[in-house]
Amino acid sequence: MGHLARASAVALALKPVANPIIVSMAGGIAEIPSFMGIRCEYIPGRDRLWMSRERWDAYLRDRLLALVEETDARVISFDGVVPYPGVIAARNANPKIKLVWVRRGLWQKKPQRFILGLQAKMMDAIVEPGDIARSYDFGPTSKRKDSVLTSPVSLFRQEDALSREDARKALGLDLNRPVALVQLGTGDSDVNHKMTAALEGLLGWKDLQVILTKAPVDKNGNSLAPEGLDIKVARYFPLAKVLHAFDAGICATGYNGVHELLPAQVPTVFVSNIRGTDDQEARARWCNDFGYALRADQADLADITKTVKQLQDPEVRARLSAKCAELPATTGGQEIADILYALATVPAAASAKTFTFSRLMAQDHINRGIRHVANLGLRRVALVYRFIFPHKDAQETKQAPPIFGDSIVPAELHALIKSSTRFEHLITGASSVYRAKREGIAMSAYGDLVEFFKK
């Protein structure tokens, strides 16, 4: 959800002067249209395995080009670590489009760093959202001179945030009892153990209410929460609006968590997720070293419990909250919006970057080939294993024609996105010409006829 939160902050800043549209492969996009009044389109990601990698690249390109033509968009802004080949191909197919890479800093030294130069050359501009921990950034983007640095981006805005009382009413909480927010993931066993260790650190906090954004259960439905906690699972979007409800927070050290909880002055323990490109440990160390938050050792379950327990001390909470008042303003959303608007109002140089694009695609194919060889043996071992021990309840994608829909009701959109039926989402107010073009794109991608569904 990190890119969605940043994109939402930028889109909200653009609304007075432009018509921003958010496109994403994340299911969380279902929350945005009705709650923020921003038009959105969901695109099924490559991980759905509904088509080959090469076909998906072309599908993404065609979806973006069709949306640009429908809306007369001037700029495509990509927020992520690796710009998809389909995104770059869309820019190359229509040189009148300007492509901006919103490239977050604090990268770990992962293989993606080797093609940073080629990727940068395909962009019309690169913007780095500021990070309060930037002085601890020693990753591959930290020394590059190809980006414009802005202030940090956050959906939390003091002027929009609900008061403590109103926020608690919105979440259905007792107004007088303490509340702790826990935003840690579940899934693999090590991640689950961290969730349990963090919750154990809250035991003994008198009258505490614990709010989680997802149920604390493993993949088999077994509870990860210790006995004795009053736990409630609550979904509220955007969560930044109700942060004043909380007396304490336990969160992964992702960009959004840090730049929402700390500006809201929520006393927080950070438990880093070391997977992926984001250097969460560097961010957590900075927050701890300068007194803005507490860092738990993500590799030590006992330390997680011990560190979280410190939040039960009102003096610790008061100290952390007061320190967070010193943080700089998180005005990066408006700054990025200004950059995008300026680019949109200046005529584009109509030249495709064909040579650089070809080099980048060649490198991408080489990387895929290396991964393919490395994974081939593992895949065959896995196939033999799965033949001997088949899945008991394998879910298959329904091979029916794709369904087109333009619902913006979160529950309906969530259900369509998560279903096994191939779902094609349309922006609100789509023209008949756009519908027809999208039908052709779907036929090329899936090879079936399509059905239309409207709510």
Locations of the language-model features?
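C-terminal amphipathic helix plus adjacent low-complexity
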Residues: 312-401
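Short N-terminal targeting/anchoring amphipathic segment
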Residues: 65-83
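Catalytic binding pocket for nucleotide-activated donors in carbohydrate/polymer assembly enzymes
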Residues: 257-305
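A short, glycine/small-residue-rich beta-strand->loop->alpha-helix junction that serves as a flexible
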Residues: 1-6, 189-191
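Conserved nucleotide-sugar phosphate-binding/catalytic loop shared by glycosyltransferases and other
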Residues: 13-66, 297
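Donor-nucleotide binding loops and adjacent catalytic segments primarily
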Residues: 165-248
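Acidic donor-binding loop of glycosyltransferase active sites
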Residues: 243-257, 266
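A nucleotide-sugar donor-handling region in carbohydrate enzymes
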Residues: 104, 109-111, 119-186
